[in-house]
Amino acid sequence: MGNIYTKDIKRIVKEIYNQYKDEIKDDYNTNKQIVVRYVDVKSKKVRNRIAGYLTRYYKIMKEKETSPTEEKEEISEEI
């Protein structure tokens, strides 16, 4: 079973992703440093949740960007 993240964590992650898209990677530790740098989080648990969801969100968005082109390539190969 996966974790369910609150609306606040999702909102913060989307804001970070939209503003600092170029700095975010698929590495958790790198994203944790980004969260420390740009978000004032007092709780270690919340910081880690934000960094974890940011990593997952990055992978999802990266997959969405590449999937339409892959489908077009598969269709053209079949023809």
Curated annotation (Swiss-Prot):
GO MF assignments: structural constituent of ribosome
Top-level taxonomic group: Archaea
Name of the protein described by the UniProt record: Small ribosomal subunit protein eS17
Keywords assigned by UniProt, alphabetized: Ribonucleoprotein, Ribosomal protein
An example Gene Ontology CC term for this record: ribosome
GO biological process: translation
Alphabetized InterPro entries for the sequence: Ribosomal_eS17, Ribosomal_eS17_CS, Ribosomal_eS17_sf
The family this protein is said to belong to: Belongs to the eukaryotic ribosomal protein eS17 family.
Keyword Ribonucleoprotein: yes
PANTHER family linked to this entry: 40S RIBOSOMAL PROTEIN S17
HAMAP family referenced in this protein's UniProt entry, alphabetically: Ribosomal_eS17
